[in-house]
Amino acid sequence: MRRNDGERHCVQWSRGARKFFGKNPEIIDIPDLIEVQKASYDQFLMMNTAPEDRPNEGLQAAFKSVFPIKAFSGAAMLEFVSYEFDPPKFDVDDCLRRDLTYAVPLKIILRLIVFDVDEFTGAKSIKDIKEQSIYMGDVPLMTKDG
């Protein structure tokens, strides 16, 4: 007696072809379930958007909600200017081989404004302005497979 395993056919998906041994053929394509998460994370980071073109959402909104930071005395203020990502230190394959997180360095550009405050009138005048790029840490990235 011969066993009937049904028809074999291949189903294509993001990681390649997969053999299907079911009796009924696939009616719809297998959805890329991670696509929503990848698109959302890309929208949060806005890596491919120029700093001056970024809308006030995602990581940009997070930084804007914290800054400016003002000194209690009113003599200084720290403003958020923008953020940028450096290229990843290692590519995806190197990270897999070395058991590392695939990530990019995040730097923010801050502006320090120092005021000269008049003791009698309380009037402020700008004494000094400095801008500096500051390393904030590594931000994990999602690969094409999630």
Curated annotation (Swiss-Prot):
GO molecular function, one term: DNA binding
UniProt GO BP: DNA-templated transcription
Enzyme Commission (EC) number: 2.7.7.6
GO terms for cellular component: DNA-directed RNA polymerase complex
A Pfam match: RNA_pol_Rpb2_1
UniProt entry keywords in alphabetical sequence: DNA-directed RNA polymerase, Nucleotidyltransferase, Transcription, Transferase
InterPro entries: RNA_pol_bsu_protrusion (IPR007644)
Catalyzed reaction equations: RNA(n) + a ribonucleoside 5'-triphosphate = RNA(n+1) + diphosphate
Keyword Ion transport: no
KW rRNA-binding (keyword) present: no
Protein purpose: DNA-dependent RNA polymerase catalyzes the transcription of DNA into RNA using the four ribonucleoside triphosphates as substrates.
Subunit field text: The RNAP catalytic core consists of 2 alpha, 1 beta, 1 beta' and 1 omega subunit. When a sigma factor is associated with the core the holoenzyme is formed, which can initiate transcription.
Family: Belongs to the RNA polymerase beta chain family.
The protein, known as: DNA-directed RNA polymerase subunit beta
Organism (species): Liberibacter africanus
Upper taxonomic lineage: Bacteria, Pseudomonadati, Pseudomonadota, Alphaproteobacteria, Hyphomicrobiales
Gene behind this protein: rpoB
